[in-house]
Amino acid sequence: MPYRISRQAYAETYGPTTGDRIRLADTELILEVEKDFTTYGDEVKFGGGKVIRDGMGQSQTSRAGGAVDTVITNALILDWWGIVKADIGLKDGRIVGIGKAGNPDIQEGVTIVIGPGTEAIAGEGHILTAGGIDTHIHFICPQQIETALASGVTTLMGGGTGPATGTNATTCTPGAFHIGRMLQAAEGLPVNLGFFGKGNASTPEALEEQVRAGACGLKLHEDWGTTPAAIDACLSVADQMDVQVCIHTDTLNEAGFVEDTIAAIKGRTIHTFHTEGAGGGHAPDIIKICGEANVLPSSTNPTRPYTRNTLEEHLDMLMVCHHLDPKIPEDVAFAESRIRRETIAAEDILHDLGAFSIIASDSQAMGRVGEVITRTFQTAHKMKVQRGALPEDSSRNDNHRLKRYIAKVTINPAIAHGISSQVGSVETGKLADLVLWKPGFFGIRPQLVVKGGSIVWAQMGDANASIPTPGPVHGRPMFAAFGKALAPSCLTFMSDAAMNDNIQSKLGLKRTCIAVENTREVGKSALKLNSALPNMSVDPQTYEVFADGELLTCEPAEVLPLAQRYLLL
């Protein structure tokens, strides 16, 4: 006779199953399990007296015979494509199976074979996501990498050379020399990395040189002069060499207005940074560019979400980052023109509608590198509280909203930058960059981070203790972050032209280098669950934002989840 246990006892032993609901941390966001790939009564679990033992859940199959290197058991996957319970198999640093793990000699329906060479990670009671992707990094200091990793971000793309004045303001690694040095520095950093060259030039030669030197994209920034001529030249080189172009448009409207920038883009694919405008861009109406089909619009996290403190902290941040002088009235006026409560409030709603598609940090240049995922789900929480359930959701769960928001920090930045064949989702064939979260800490503090199939970061107690759990428990780098294990666990992204020019060998790089691809063929319609194209307008006097004729406005949050309850500040 089969043995029956209560739903609560089952969840406590094997994790939640189909129909179970979970609150994410201290938010109002509720997740419901859509499908369970494991088999009731035949689940695999590691431990004394448990299932993964020789002749039981562990087969005799060798690694060469098909057994996986690692199995993550009974994890609850949250990704853009679904919310499912499954075992996950990892081999050679890649995801090779999502389904039912075990011993096919005695168990039915096994799709992931456990053998003597298989390690086990207990996913029961944990949420599993793809590693986050942050595509707006100012590489000001290498300590950012550890902070990002501690938040669940495993891929960083951007520009910079360290705390140079140019890097403090712009995400550009200018010129072949600096690109080479940053690619060499990446060898010791335990995340995937890609670097943007400076895109501000009116003729192609210097831009092509940077792409051949190893840039994975080009960045147009107003502080270097984002003129229509520079926009056109940069996009022309990008189209020729298949790299993405990111743009920070002209706040002062010196070389033209938003309509002139749209005209200069000529319908070509472009990733617009901080599309609301507080981070920089045509004042006051750059936000309306999110209605263009060729534009991939992103936000940076200082305006995520709109709170009672958002406006107050922005002015000083902006003055420092852009090398402005508070004694010069024109500099102060420049800064103040970028900070508008109306457009920041509208940005919240545009994210909830799926009209803004990506969230990134703007690290140490107004944004916080360790808060990308936190700010994303704070925004989702605020929108549920203020706007209620999405039409696709119900009173039972917020599944569609959760998929929409997780896509903003995983698959969509990967698609935008031509790396989605490698990273950005929990799918077979992709690099095993995975994050395990306890539900009570979702979005704020990962329990464990897997990088290229090996554990790179984890919550860990006193190293001198008799067991791993005694305090102080905090996030620490693990073995995949050290020695020669680091290089095979990580990817460096660059242009196909650089790969063909053998930059990897010329610079002595040991990491796996991958060419970005298909960056010029994507439009907003390719971005998962975030492809809305509203007809946008902005009142030039009041700064009120309208989408399809509807005023977009909301109140600032007074209190947020994923905040002081979790932080000793």
UniProtKB/Swiss-Prot annotation:
Residues modified to N6-carboxylysine: 219
Binding-site list for Ni(2+) 2: 219, 248, 274
CDD domains: Urease_alpha
Record pathway: Nitrogen metabolism; urea degradation; CO(2) and NH(3) from urea (urease route): step 1/1
Domain Urease: 131-569
Xref: Gene3D superfamilies: Metal-dependent hydrolases, Urease, subunit C, domain 1
Cofactor(s) for this UniProt protein: Ni cation
Textual note on the cofactor: Binds 2 nickel ions per subunit.
Organism superkingdom: Bacteria
Enzyme class: hydrolase
SS bonds (residue pairs): none
Gene Ontology MF term list: nickel cation binding; urease activity
GO biological process, one term: urea catabolic process
Entry keywords, A to Z: Cytoplasm, Hydrolase, Metal-binding, Nickel
GO cellular component: a single term: cytoplasm
Assembly behavior: Heterotrimer of UreA (gamma), UreB (beta) and UreC (alpha) subunits. Three heterotrimers associate to form the active enzyme.
Family: Belongs to the metallo-dependent hydrolases superfamily. Urease alpha subunit family.
Protein name: Urease subunit alpha
Organism in which the protein naturally occurs: Synechococcus sp. (strain CC9311)
Gene: ureC
